[in-house]
């Protein structure tokens, strides 16, 4: 018994010692030795240089009484280049403490200039460094601003294939405390060439005060191409069809700013011409070298509507809306096609002869099964050349909160109550106002591959469920509602797939105008323009309590069953462990009892 007591005491001491070590490690957090040099974080604007040591954990709060927001810019960050962001970083919080919403995080691995804005008049930033002893410094610039005030010509969206922009007030000195963002977005298949014909900002080795940041993509986190300042004429080239340019200035030393122009280059090789079709437009690309071989100039090209002009770069591009620019729509045998003609302007009426071949480029988009077919042919002295490729309809389907179909539900998976009314809308994304959407079939399944079992909500345009209500035809939208259910002997996931038919409103014999018909009467196989849309999963709310909110949910009952052997193995292992513990305890008790008996009957030694 004495040995048992000692073992028990040692166990208690070991546990208490371990708890004390954990507590010491948790409480022994790095302290902050970095200094702001007496700076007042209540000033309207301030530039700060922070020199940091290893094992720092520093937090500062910027705050003023007036109701204005704060913009903080970390224009130069020198942290441990080998440290992970989890161990060494800068975190910025919206509010007076680190318990506020996290606005963002920056570390040595980031490829952008970190800029954050508060929602109100207070902002907190925290800098944590690891144990590595390297030189660290962070340049911080912040200022208060009113969110409702703007600087003229400060940023914007540029969507043409070529253009130009400049700093506000150019060529006069740029304004103070300016933060301007220009987004350049051109058509797919192009890349952007940006050229600064003049750049005159405050000079600094690290461009900490006034600078321009150029990003290779659609946002300020797309990947920094370069941060520039001073004087020069830098050039940049994007890797895609988007580029972002930022101008940031402080409160002193304003100069002329900059002037920049950009042009687009079509990346893919086009020997003669190409055509692609979307739900709202036709896109024709013509090679300039092809035109030159015919002794034509791009300025002589025109559509059925001569006012619709092409965009010219290293290629000539026509972006032709399906219901504008003289596009002709034709309905034949339940097939919709869109046609336009690119021609070359005729010789002057005073001319008597010509040695140029008469050339026409006829472009047609024809709607096909679950896709669109593009057909392009050229007539050249009565010689026809054909070309065809494939595209797809642009459709989507989503859940809405009510029958007004105003508030889209973004949550996925979407948790519902059993028998709750659900509102579904299928949408055709097109600029053609004369098209209408018809819901031919809508089917539910417990799995995303729609294997057996399935359950029909709508079939042949008819409601097959007592709670399902199909709404009347409504332009580009097909709508219905039904009450939530679950599949027996399966998990509570439900996926929906709808077959959508697209008709022209002027075609009174179309399938869309027939409504609900029996399977014997309908003639869908001859229909060329239909497509599928899928949404899901929809799950019961009680499964949220079981599975949590992670969204990583099992999709079939078989998947759940496949995990059961692992659970049985865990149970068996636990039982074996418990049995071993019982055996050890029993043996120990018997050992001490036997020793106690030996001591109890030990014969006294006779002297």
Curated annotation (Swiss-Prot):
<feature type="disulfide bond">
    <location>
        <begin position="442"/>
        <end position="498"/>
    </location>
</feature>
<feature type="signal peptide">
    <location>
        <begin position="1"/>
        <end position="19"/>
    </location>
</feature>
<feature type="glycosylation site" description="N-linked (GlcNAc...) asparagine">
    <location>
        <position position="22"/>
    </location>
</feature>
<dbReference type="InterPro" id="IPR001507">
    <property type="entry name" value="ZP_dom"/>
</dbReference>
<protein>
    <recommendedName>
        <fullName>CUB and zona pellucida-like domain-containing protein 1</fullName>
    </recommendedName>
</protein>
<feature type="glycosylation site" description="N-linked (GlcNAc...) asparagine">
    <location>
        <position position="195"/>
    </location>
</feature>
<keyword id="KW-1133">Transmembrane helix</keyword>
<feature type="topological domain" description="Lumenal">
    <location>
        <begin position="20"/>
        <end position="568"/>
    </location>
</feature>
<dbReference type="GO" id="GO:0016020">
    <property type="term" value="C:membrane"/>
</dbReference>
<feature type="topological domain" description="Cytoplasmic">
    <location>
        <begin position="590"/>
        <end position="607"/>
    </location>
</feature>
<keyword id="KW-0812">Transmembrane</keyword>
<keyword id="KW-0732">Signal</keyword>
<dbReference type="Pfam" id="PF00100">
    <property type="entry name" value="Zona_pellucida"/>
</dbReference>
<feature type="disulfide bond">
    <location>
        <begin position="85"/>
        <end position="107"/>
    </location>
</feature>
<dbReference type="GO" id="GO:0042588">
    <property type="term" value="C:zymogen granule"/>
</dbReference>
<feature type="disulfide bond">
    <location>
        <begin position="154"/>
        <end position="180"/>
    </location>
</feature>
<dbReference type="InterPro" id="IPR048290">
    <property type="entry name" value="ZP_chr"/>
</dbReference>
<dbReference type="Pfam" id="PF23344">
    <property type="entry name" value="ZP-N"/>
</dbReference>
<dbReference type="GO" id="GO:0032023">
    <property type="term" value="P:trypsinogen activation"/>
</dbReference>
<keyword id="KW-0968">Cytoplasmic vesicle</keyword>
<feature type="disulfide bond">
    <location>
        <begin position="207"/>
        <end position="229"/>
    </location>
</feature>
<feature type="glycosylation site" description="N-linked (GlcNAc...) asparagine">
    <location>
        <position position="419"/>
    </location>
</feature>
<dbReference type="GO" id="GO:0007565">
    <property type="term" value="P:female pregnancy"/>
</dbReference>
<comment type="function">
    <text>Localized to zymogen granules, where it functions in trypsinogen activation. May indirectly regulate cell motility, cell-cell and cell/extracellular matrix interactions.</text>
</comment>
<feature type="domain" description="CUB 1">
    <location>
        <begin position="32"/>
        <end position="146"/>
    </location>
</feature>
<feature type="disulfide bond">
    <location>
        <begin position="32"/>
        <end position="58"/>
    </location>
</feature>
<dbReference type="Pfam" id="PF00431">
    <property type="entry name" value="CUB"/>
</dbReference>
<dbReference type="GO" id="GO:0009986">
    <property type="term" value="C:cell surface"/>
</dbReference>
<keyword id="KW-0325">Glycoprotein</keyword>
<dbReference type="InterPro" id="IPR000859">
    <property type="entry name" value="CUB_dom"/>
</dbReference>
<keyword id="KW-0677">Repeat</keyword>
<feature type="glycosylation site" description="N-linked (GlcNAc...) asparagine">
    <location>
        <position position="67"/>
    </location>
</feature>
<feature type="domain" description="ZP">
    <location>
        <begin position="276"/>
        <end position="519"/>
    </location>
</feature>
<dbReference type="InterPro" id="IPR055355">
    <property type="entry name" value="ZP-C"/>
</dbReference>
<dbReference type="InterPro" id="IPR055356">
    <property type="entry name" value="ZP-N"/>
</dbReference>
<dbReference type="GO" id="GO:0005615">
    <property type="term" value="C:extracellular space"/>
</dbReference>
<feature type="domain" description="CUB 2">
    <location>
        <begin position="154"/>
        <end position="265"/>
    </location>
</feature>
<feature type="transmembrane region" description="Helical">
    <location>
        <begin position="569"/>
        <end position="589"/>
    </location>
</feature>
<keyword id="KW-1015">Disulfide bond</keyword>
<dbReference type="GO" id="GO:0009755">
    <property type="term" value="P:hormone-mediated signaling pathway"/>
</dbReference>
<dbReference type="GO" id="GO:0042589">
    <property type="term" value="C:zymogen granule membrane"/>
</dbReference>
<dbReference type="InterPro" id="IPR042235">
    <property type="entry name" value="ZP-C_dom"/>
</dbReference>
